[in-house]
């Protein structure tokens, strides 16, 4: 049994986390500014304390004394039209709130040994088709700057010996709250569809997996630094819209033009149109297992739980045995140049990626061939790279999507 503090405990993610901690037998101190607290927090010790306020550090330090870990989720919601005052609250609630929590932990005599702080996919800004592992540099738009300041404050805890994890969360999917809850009425009415071009990458994670990853971060000493809290099932906004429409058995063809989104939502619209091809590299390396890895199954679980329905999938499976030593086979098939050897000359296969090509996890390759004189281009991502053993590549663009 552990003693865990959770800030932002009355939010939909915080409430789910507190419920999971209590269910496994942990003691929980739930911090909230007050208001209508969910009944499920009843077995937690409630501290009515605004951790984003000036002067809260002494009271906060007293409450954190003797805890094993703190999960910091408090912060102003980014949803809605952004006024200058709203943007200031978004920034200050994260920077000041995190600073207060870190200062309070530092003031403890026997303080927490682990600190898990929320961050967001906005850290990367809009990056089109660039694969984004935790090593990628930050973006330079408003939310990216907020996340940089947020994580900088959080990582101060590591300077005095507290194991610190920053979870860069994608779109957290739940039926009762968050972005998906706002989308559901529109899609149920049959007027939902892609936003803008729909080609932007939308990193996402089921609420249950988001909470499970927080528990994983609390429990595993090897987990530290930035962690992309997203599903490995990479998806564009257009595919997300199609999958949601299928889960609801409703059409999903009503595009929302970028200009219209900008007029209605202002600067906030850019967060919906931004593209982040986030890879959960660190979580995979640490051995985290997703319960809801597939987008189609995750959406069915949320909108139609217990139905037993399965998403409609067309699967083509093929295998081939090569009678040669594995290192030799790996060397041949992992070299993209050899794709030309395997492709009929009439298709005029070409590699567009500049050479030399360093094959590795996260590597992106561009190809072109011609079919009856028409050029076809596609793009693949090396999703897994285990030298001399195996590799997995995923098509991002091309004729099979």
Per-segment meaning from a language model:
Residues 4-24:
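N-terminal Rossmann NAD(P)H-binding glycine-rich loop of SDR-like oxidoreductase domains
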Residues 40-97:
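NAD(P)H-binding glycine-rich loop region in Rossmannoid oxidoreductase-like domains
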Residues 82-87, 99-141:
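Conserved Rossmann-fold NAD(P)-dependent oxidoreductase catalytic core, especially the SDR/UDP-sugar
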Residues 119, 152-175:
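Conserved beta-loop-beta element that borders a ligand/cofactor-binding pocket
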Residues 148, 162, 173-182, 217-227:
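Glycine/proline-rich active-site loop of Rossmann-fold NAD(P)-dependent oxidoreductases
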Residues 184-192, 200-234:
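Alpha-helical substrate-binding/gating segment
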Residues 213, 220-267, 300-310:
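Mid/C-terminal beta-alpha module of Rossmann-like enzyme folds, strongest
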Residues 278, 304-360:
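Hydrophobic ligand-binding cavity/cleft-lining segments
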């Amino acid at each position: 049994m552990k003693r865990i503090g959770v800030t932002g405990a009355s939010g939909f993610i915080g409430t789910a986390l507190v419920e999971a901690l209590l269910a496994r037998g942990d003691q929980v101190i739930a911090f909230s500014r007050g208001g209508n607290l969910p009944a499920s927090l009843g077995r937690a010790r409630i501290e009515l304390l605004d951790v984003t306020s000036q002067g809260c550090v002494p009271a906060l330090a007293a409450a954190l004394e003797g805890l094993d870990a703190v999960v910091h989720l408090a912060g102003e919601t980014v949803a809605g039209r952004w006024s200058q005052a709203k943007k200031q609250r978004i920034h200050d609630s994260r920077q000041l709130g995190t600073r207060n929590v870190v200062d309070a932990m530092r003031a403890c005599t026997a303080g927490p040994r682990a600190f898990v702080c929320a961050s967001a996919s906005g850290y990367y800004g809009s990056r089109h088709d660039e694969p984004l592992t935790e090593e990628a540099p930050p973006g330079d738009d408003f939310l990216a700057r907020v996340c940089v300041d947020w994580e900088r404050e959080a990582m101060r805890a590591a300077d005095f010996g507290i194991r610190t994890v920053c979870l860069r969360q994608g779109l957290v999917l739940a039926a009762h709250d968050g972005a998906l809850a706002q989308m559901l009425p529109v899609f149920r009415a049959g007027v939902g569809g892609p936003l803008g071009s729909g080609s932007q990458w939308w990193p996402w994670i089921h609420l249950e997996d988001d909470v499970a990853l927080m528990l994983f971060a609390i429990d595993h000493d090897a987990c530290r630094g930035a962690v992309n809290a997203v599903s490995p099932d990479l998806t564009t906004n257009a595919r997300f819209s199609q999958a949601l429409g299928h889960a609801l058995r409703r059409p999903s063809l009503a595009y929302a033009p970028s200009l219209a989104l900008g007029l209605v939502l202002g600067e906030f619209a850019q967060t919906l149109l931004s593209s982040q091809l986030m890879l959960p590299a660190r979580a995979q390396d640490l051995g985290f297992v997703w319960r809801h890895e597939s987008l189609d199954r995750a959406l069915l679980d949320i909108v139609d739980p217990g139905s037993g329905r399965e998403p409609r999938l067309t699967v083509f499976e093929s295998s081939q045995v090569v009678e040669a030593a594995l290192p030799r086979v790996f060397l041949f098939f992992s070299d993209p140049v050899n794709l030309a050897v395997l492709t009929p000359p009439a298709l005029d296969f070409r590699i567009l990626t500049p050479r030399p090509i360093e094959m590795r996890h996260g590597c992106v390759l561009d190809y072109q061939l011609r079919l009856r004189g028409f050029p076809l281009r596609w793009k693949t991502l090396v999703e897994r790279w285990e030298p001399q053993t195996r590799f997995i590549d995923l098509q991002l663009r091309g004729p099979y999507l």
